[in-house]
Amino acid sequence: MSQNTLKVHDLNEDAEFDENGVEAFDEKALSEEEPSDNDLAEEELLSQGATQRVLDATQLYLGEIGYSPLLTAEEEVYFARRALRGDVASRRRMIESNLRLVVKIARRYGNRGLALLDLIEEGNLGLIRAVEKFDPERGFRFSTYATWWIRQTIERAIMNQTRTIRLPIHIVKELNVYLRTARELSHKLDHEPSAEEIAEQLDKPVDDVSRMLRLNERITSVDTPLGGDSEKALLDILADEKENGPEDTTQDDDMKQSIVKWLFELNAKQREVLARRFGLLGYEAATLEDVGREIGLTRERVRQIQVEGLRRLREILQTQGLNIEALFRE
């Protein structure tokens, strides 16, 4: 028997055939395997139901926290002092009175990979941390201090979900060629090569090389860990000015005044480099190369001063019970 011959026992003994010998399939059985309009409608209703439950839970939570009265400046100091001495009721009062602040901040981070309730939950952790760390004798309003910690915990949660900066693959490949050549030249020349030296090595226009190196620097400058015990990058903590509304004016003014005060505890060179690099004190954020050109220093020297300035700034903030993330963000 050839391999193409159909064996009788290969047939379904219960199969029905039409008059042409073609097996007649059970159309009812087939239709049951495909989703009907009713099935799709049911799935849509289930999805809508799940969404509605999330909305209901959110509204319920917002309704509950709406009954917590805000504290006056005097009440903040009173309850903060008692909380520092271990009074649980005062600690709870400070947390409950600022839950709406968490919601306001969390709403700014919508469509960033986490649901609103998840953002609120993360922000509440930051609020609790702020209550534990807050010292009313330092002159801050608690809302300003808490905002830093709330934003930091939310940003960290979002960071764990996704990175923000993406480059087209052809740009990445071209950039890698320039960076590899720069590394090779730095070993050969015993100094960091200039854009002109890289361009000559690759036989490329200097402007093209400079543009790509500036692109890389803008990315890495905000995507490089700040150092110390922090693995967080400036990308994850720099404020988005579009987030600020009129209601943020008071706490933003407090924050700016604090930043200016701390920057002026650095030496003049460190202060100018950090201000120019990160867009502070009225400067536009600039690359190491651009800053060096403006103040008459090499790119490498500017980088060294930046590292020294951030290290000194971290020390200053630690004496205030803060960290460098709290300064640059949120």
Swiss-Prot record:
GO BP term, example: DNA-templated transcription initiation
Region (Sigma-70 factor domain-2): 94-164
DNA-binding region, residue intervals: 288-307
Result after altering E132Q: In strain: 1706
InterPro entries the record matches: RNA_pol_sigma-70_dom, RNA_pol_sigma70, RNA_pol_sigma70_r1_2, RNA_pol_sigma70_r2, RNA_pol_sigma70_r3, RNA_pol_sigma70_r4, RNA_pol_sigma_r2, RNA_pol_sigma_r3/r4-like
Database matches in SUPFAM superfamilies: Sigma2 domain of RNA polymerase sigma factors, Sigma3 and sigma4 domains of RNA polymerase sigma factors
Impact after mutating E33D: In strain: 1674
Motif Interaction with polymerase core subunit RpoC boundaries: 118-121
Entry's localization field: Cytoplasm
Region (Sigma-70 factor domain-4): 262-315
PANTHER family the UniProt entry points to: RNA POLYMERASE SIGMA FACTOR RPO, RNA POLYMERASE SIGMA FACTOR RPOS
Family statement: Belongs to the sigma-70 factor family. RpoS subfamily.
Assembly notes: Interacts with the RNA polymerase core enzyme.
Name of this protein: RNA polymerase sigma factor RpoS
Organism listed in the record: Salmonella typhimurium (strain LT2 / SGSC1412 / ATCC 700720)
